[in-house]
Amino acid sequence: MKLSHAPHMGASGSFRERLSAMSTKPILLASAALLATAALTACGGQQTASRDNVRAVGSSTVLPFAKAVAEQLAKSNPGIPAPIVESTGTGAGMKLFCAGVGVQHPDIENASRRMKKSEFEDCVKNGVKDIVEIQVGLDGIAFAEANGGPGMDLTPTDIYKALAKNPFGKPQTAKTWKDVNPALSDEPILVYGPPSTSGTRDALKELILAKGCESDPAMKALKDSDKPKYEANCTEVREDGAYVDSGENDNLIVQKLEANPKAIGVFGFSYLESNADKIKGLKVSGIVPTYASISDFSYPGARPLYIYVKKAHLEAIKGLKEFVAEWAKSWGKDGLLAKAGMVVAPDAVQATSLTAATDFTTLDGASLK
């Protein structure tokens, strides 16, 4: 996955000026909102004509941050009900988000990876043609264990050889970490991680497993010559019990690590940071997941976090514009999200995100993979 570093804003105004303007921007006339609601109802067919709350679905990694912003919105705006935020996983959330326009469909998709081109095409096919992409911060895929664990230093190749269903095109036979690398522990491989619907799982495959697989030039060559075979060999996860799908509940993984110090868990960095009294991060290529190593991208598992907003819902769903504005007020270095554990994006990325959050610039599907 390519992490985006957006250019600084130009003549349109400084970052702080744009952010300040968000809180003083006039509210559109009620008649415009009513017209938008009527249009949205028409899109939604026979479904209910209104909804009291903004509805967001998607990533379990983004969930605690989205909840924090939702609570702040309700606190700052007594007339706006708190948005409903659901943890469905990024992939499942994309399906819900892209299912259509109308009050029966979500307004926002929280994502721990960028939208895929195939998902964008599904959206367009179902009438969701105008989508606003906003990068809200950074995160890292953390590999963690209980504080009393052996403390291994892993590489992407180690992790790939331990978790791949067909490492380097051969059947998986590794039972212990020592089978993977003689320098590692002889403890059995037991990894609790995200399900296939999770953006964290997608990032694990793209940032770690694929990188480990491509250490073999023959496997790397398959990426262009035989994509299905490449994916089968490089990104499919073993299903023999060594990797345990733990659902979209990252707190459950933390509990499992406490109960079994020999196991490893995979989840977003914020869960590692908020449970530092119980678990510790493992080094990947000699680098511990920290705020600093994710912020400067030296940690191999660093990744961006996004929200996707359905532009057709902006005027019709009460509080949606304000919710987006609350995100923008919260993602700075001294903001609510940093205090909640999110890694703040570089200034240039924040500036581009602010433009998207104020101008509601729509996503160009040609930029997606």
Where are these regions (language model features)?
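Flexible loop/hinge segments at secondary-structure junctions
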Residues: 44-369
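Bacterial N-terminal signal peptides that target proteins for export
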Residues: 4-9, 14-30
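C-terminal motif of bacterial Sec signal peptides marking the signal peptidase cleavage site
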Residues: 39-42
